[in-house]
Each structure stands twice: as structure tokens, then as C-alpha cells.
Amino acid sequence: MIPDDEFIKNPSVPGPTAMEVRCLIMCLAEPGKNDVAVDVGCGTGGVTLELAGRVRRVYAIDRNPEAISTTEMNLQRHGLGDNVTLMEGDAPEALCKIPDIDIAVVGGSGGELQEILRIIKDKLKPGGRIIVTAILLETKFEAMECLRDLGFDVNITELNIARGRALDRGTMMVSRNPVALIYTGVSHENKD
């Protein structure tokens, strides 16, 4: 895992996704060297970079041009990116342009989560995995309900991370925002 402080950051771009969250995302995604993955709402590229070192192809999508630029700089900084396609634009339109996928990570949806998940379902190969990260309660509920409506078994895990900070008299644990991972695998419905 790439430590958080090794990412180039941009004040107008969220991220990077905390290292501990990226670690669990990779465990749930089970990336394989022949997999094709998409990172929707790539931000600074934390998840994109982790996937890039583990899969055949990554499509990184963000509507914010500064996010795409920051992700590109982070890929270059870490010697990754030969297998990454950066796509600036709205996720539903961009998703329609990519091939079928094995892994989908949705870290930002711009209010279009249901449409994004419907398109991902149509693009998901048999045995594919979907992981949605959420900090808002409404997003957690929306993701769970939408994935269930699409025929998936849905799981949710919430991470409450605290990191130690040295003080004169000891170490204080400093909490970060809780992050939920809503995840699933194979759909109950047959893909036509």
C-alpha cells in the first residue's frame, strides 16, 4: 500500500482515500493480473494506483479536470500508469465507453449513483465485484437499496480509523471520518 503522505494532493480534489480504506478495498476487490477495473470518482488516484499495480487495465473516471490531472501526476510519481486510461467526464457517459469489467470501485457519484450502478451491472463480468465507498448516510442507504434492487447480495462494513499522534506525554489517537464500504459480487440474475 502506498502511504497517504506519498500522494500529490490538490485542495480542490478529495483524497487520497486513506491507506487503511484502500487496503480493505483491495481485499474485497480481490484484483487479479488479468482483471479489468474501473475507479469512478478517482479523485487524487489512491484507489486507481493500488489497482494499477495489480490488474491488466484500469479506467479512472472523474468529472473534475483537476482530479484527472492529480491522478496522472500521482501515477507518474509512482511509476504507474501504462495500464491506466484516464477519462474526464460524467461517469454514466464514460462507463458506456469502456469494455466489460471485473471490478468496479465507486468513490464518487456526483448524485448519479443509481444510474452508475445500473450501468456497472450491465458491464460486470460473471464473478465481478462492486465496492461503493460512502461517508454520507444517504449514500450508504442509496447504494444498498440500489444494489439489492439490481439483484445483488449486499454487504456493508464501516471503518472508524484512528491514527496515533505523538504528544509530549504520550500518544493521542486522532480519529478520521468513518467510511462505509458497500460491496457485493455476483448478481442473482443471469446476464443476457
UniProtKB/Swiss-Prot annotation:
It catalyses: Co-precorrin-6B + S-adenosyl-L-methionine = Co-precorrin-7 + S-adenosyl-L-homocysteine + CO2. GO terms for biological process: anaerobic cobalamin biosynthetic process; methylation. Pfam families: Methyltransf_31. Keywords: Cobalamin biosynthesis, Methyltransferase, S-adenosyl-L-methionine, Transferase. It is an enzyme of class 2 (transferase). GO terms for molecular function: cobalt-precorrin-6B C5-methyltransferase activity; protein methyltransferase activity. Its EC number is 2.1.1.196. CDD domains: AdoMet_MTases (cd02440). InterPro entries: CbiT, Cbl_synth_MTase_CbiT, Cobalamin_biosynth_MTase, Methyltranfer_dom, SAM-dependent_MTases_sf. S-adenosyl-L-methionine binds at T17, G41, C42, G43, T44, G45, D62, A91. Pathway: Cofactor biosynthesis; adenosylcobalamin biosynthesis; cob(II)yrinate a,c-diamide from sirohydrochlorin (anaerobic route): step 8/10. It comes from the Archaea. Belongs to the methyltransferase superfamily. Archaeal-type CbiT family. Homotetramer. This is Probable cobalt-precorrin-6B C(15)-methyltransferase (decarboxylating).
